Amino acid sequence: MEIDLNADLGEGCGSDEALLDLVTSANIACGWHAGGANAMRDCVRWAVQKGVAIGAHPSFHDPENFGRKEMQLPAGDIYAGVLYQLGALSAIAQAEGGRIAHVKPHGALYNQAARDPMIADAVVSAIHDFDPSLAVFGLANSVFVAAARQAGLAAVEEVFADRGYRADGSLVPRSEPGALIDDEDAVLARTLDMVRDRQVRAVSGEWVPLNAQTVCLHGDGPHALAFARRIREALEKAGVEVVAPGVLQAGEGI
């Protein structure tokens, strides 16, 4: 059994280089919610050195809210914004001897694309028109994953061990009770449930089936790095091999 571990980098958390020793895919902020040219360059350089797959992490242009405020924008604006951010990271990756392998939207853009076909199609169209060989990372069982596959893109289904799930497979909004799971033992158990058993317990009690192909490790917080290491060690102890998704192993972006 295999699983990919990914982390969102270049967001000012300070543990990016160390996290790259634990993950197999890196989603690098493109400056619209956090980070900037220098942070992007650092993260790309480290990823190239460590053999970690490079991904773009585009968002709404919303640094004031860290890209977490939902926005209602025309499809053309979303398309252009994603294209702009892909171009910026791609240029830096090329200069550092790497290339982008995948794209994972950030924050509100991620969540809205997961449920809104218009937003999903706008993001997918930008990725496809930029480079149809790119894979996309999206919430397991989401509208975004379906839209990517419909467009002929490779889609990698993502799960979150430290986030609460609703019965429909969506994430509990951060503003609601049960959105974040702080108990480390519970998070470890949920990770194994999702990776080995392909299911997660919703906040309402039901078991929700899902296809876990990559697990997001959050790098913020004082103990995040040590906990990320615990998750990787628990997976390996359970006989799960931690590798980049098959669609990224063909040499794209590594």
UniProtKB/Swiss-Prot annotation:
GO biological process assignments: carbohydrate metabolic process
Family indicated by similarity: Belongs to the LamB/PxpA family.
Reaction it catalyzes: 5-oxo-L-proline + ATP + 2 H2O = L-glutamate + ADP + phosphate + H(+)
Name of this chain's protein: 5-oxoprolinase subunit A
InterPro entries: Glyco_hydro/deAcase_b/a-brl, LamB/YcsF/PxpA-like
Alphabetized CDD domains for the sequence: LamB_YcsF_YbgL_like
HAMAP family for the chain: PxpA
Domain of life per record: Bacteria
GO molecular function, one term: ATP binding
Subunit and interaction comment: Forms a complex composed of PxpA, PxpB and PxpC.
Species annotation: Burkholderia multivorans (strain ATCC 17616 / 249)
